[in-house]
UniProtKB/Swiss-Prot annotation:
Its main location: nucleus. A zinc finger (Matrin-type) spans 4-36. GO terms for molecular function: mRNA binding; pre-mRNA 5'-splice site binding; U1 snRNA binding; zinc ion binding. Residues 128-178 are annotated as: Disordered. The lineage of its organism: Eukaryota, Sar, Alveolata, Apicomplexa, Aconoidasida. The gene is SNRPC. It comes from Plasmodium berghei (strain Anka). This is U1 small nuclear ribonucleoprotein C.
């Protein structure tokens, strides 16, 4: 069985198995040799980090691997979002130029997969499933919903005074007497509820 040759490290591996290759590829020496190999290759071509995108020309604008931060959302490109969440990158055919910015998909340092910018909603609203009730049928009013209470047995006289336009000049004597009765009943109940010593 032929031995595996690593062209970055310029050695033959003693164990030519998938496990041995993976272990070698994850090693410190292999990674440093790979970095050095590509640095030498770029140096020979005269490419520096400053002119790297200019060297690619139009190829960089059509290749998400060569230019991932600038071109995540260009039409026709398959990016990391499409694999796990195909609806996130859905574009309408009649979108305007500000469509990307209106839904929060910016081409900046926050546009990488899985990163949530500070202060943003981690789970954005789903525009395709806004209807919370089936067929838009409203909830029925029953004992378990928040139906407003209209007929209460006891009304606060201050609230009545503010809300009742007919009795703005003088307080309704019935409400005032109810307040006195309720106050007396409360004292009476409190006196009866006191425990003897």
């Amino acid at each position: 069985m032929p031995k595996y040759y690593c062209e970055y490290c310029d050695i033959y591996l003693t164990h030519s198995s998938p496990v041995g290759r993976r272990q070698h590829n994850q090693g410190r020496k292999h990674i440093s040799a790979k970095i050095e190999y590509f640095q030498n290759l770029l140096r020979e071509e005269g490419i520096t980090p400053q002119n790297f995108l200019g060297f690619l020309g139009n190829q960089g604008y059509n290749n998400t691997l060569a230019n991932p931060m600038m071109n995540n959302f260009m039409p026709g490109n398959y990016n990391a979002y499409m694999k796990y969440n195909p609806m996130r990158n859905y574009h309408h055919s009649n979108r305007n130029s500000n469509y990307q910015h209106s839904i929060g998909m910016h081409n900046n340092k926050y546009s990488r997969a899985g990163y949530v910018p500070p202060g943003s909603n981690k789970y954005p609203n789903n525009h395709f499933h806004n209807n919370k009730r089936i067929n838009n049928i409203p909830k029925p009013y029953n004992n378990y919903t928040n139906k407003p209470i209209t007929n209460s047995s006891y009304k606060n006289d201050k609230q009545d005074y503010r809300n009742n336009n007919e009795s703005n000049d003088n307080m309704n004597s019935n409400n005032f007497s109810n307040y006195q009765v309720n106050k007396e009943n409360a004292n009476f109940v409190n006196k009866n509820n006191e425990q003897p010593n």
